[in-house]
A protein has these predicted regions:
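Short hydrophobic alpha-helical segments enriched in small aliphatic residues
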Residues: 21-24, 31, 42
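Active-site metal-binding core of divalent-cation-utilizing nuclease and nuclease-like domains
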Residues: 87-91, 104-146, 159-166, 173
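Polybasic, lysine-rich low-complexity intrinsically disordered segments
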Residues: 34-35
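Interdomain/boundary linker segments immediately adjacent to catalytic/signaling cores
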Residues: 40-126
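Active-site-adjacent loop/helix micro-motif of nuclease/hydrolase catalytic cores
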Residues: 152-167, 190-193
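N-terminal amphipathic/hydrophobic targeting modules at extreme N-termini
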Residues: 2-3, 7-9, 13-15, 40
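Domain-level recognition of nuclease-like catalytic cores that cleave nucleotide substrates
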Residues: 186-222
């Protein structure tokens, strides 16, 4: 049986479900068979949406180029762990998601943040000062120096606090970084975070108003 909070949440999110629910309620007691049909239809749509939300979704930019090899490996790592991190049944913190993904990412050559201790933080240089000393650096969740690839894993703050924009800006400033992966939840509270982030980057590339240094951006919805 579907949890009650999922039913309420998806009825609020989906116009189709709201329509079905209103039709079912408006029929009243005089036609229980039709009322039951409408609610069964609504619940089946809830089930379909929930199953889709449990899948890994991804979108690669620019859309006129195929996904690069490193991105393809990153996708496989996320796919192999989706049963433990999908945001519908496992609404866990981003650090916990990263911990689950760490073995797979490390096996593919990434250095992954383990904790907030200085020795465990992954820093990527931005500016160099006197005698070549790093003057400014940004932290990343994972970094592959040879592939020039940065990964940022977000949870609830991805869209709510525009954390994905901060990730994008910092990746553009980092030295020796050509590729960025931003992983966000498919669903957070009543927000389709992955869809909203995709819409932003669709607009960014379609408008062609901002020229950035990244060769590829991979968006992941988990």
């Amino acid at each position: 049986m579907l949890p009650a909070h999922f039913c309420r949440q998806f009825l609020e999110l989906s116009p189709i479900l709201r329509y079905n629910a209103s039709c079912g309620l408006s029929l009243g007691r005089h036609n229980r068979r039709k009322k039951l049909f409408f609610w069964c239809n609504a619940l089946s749509q809830i089930y379909i949406i929930m199953e889709l939300m449990k899948m890994l979704n991804w979108l690669y930019f620019p859309k006129n180029q195929p996904c690069d090899d490193t991105s393809a490996r990153v996708i496989k790592v996320f796919e192999s762990m989706i049963g433990q991190i999908d945001s519908v049944t496992h609404p866990i913190a981003s650090n916990d998601v990263l911990a689950i993904l760490r073995p797979g990412l490390e096996s593919n050559g990434f250095r992954v943040e383990k904790s907030k201790r200085a020795e465990d933080i992954v820093s990527v240089p931005v500016l160099f000062g006197l005698n070549g000393k790093v003057e400014k650096a940004f932290e990343a969740d994972a970094y592959h120096a040879a592939a020039k690839y940065v990964i940022e894993v977000e949870a609830g703050r991805a869209v709510l606090n525009y954390q994905f924009l901060k990730d994008f800006f910092e990746a553009c400033m980092m030295q020796n970084v050509d590729y960025l992966c931003i992983a966000v939840r498919n669903l957070y509270q009543q927000s389709h975070d992955f869809q909203r982030v995709c819409t932003f980057f669709e607009s960014l590339y379609a408008s062609n108003r901002i020229i950035h240094p990244l060769k590829g951006i991979l968006l992941l919805g988990y």
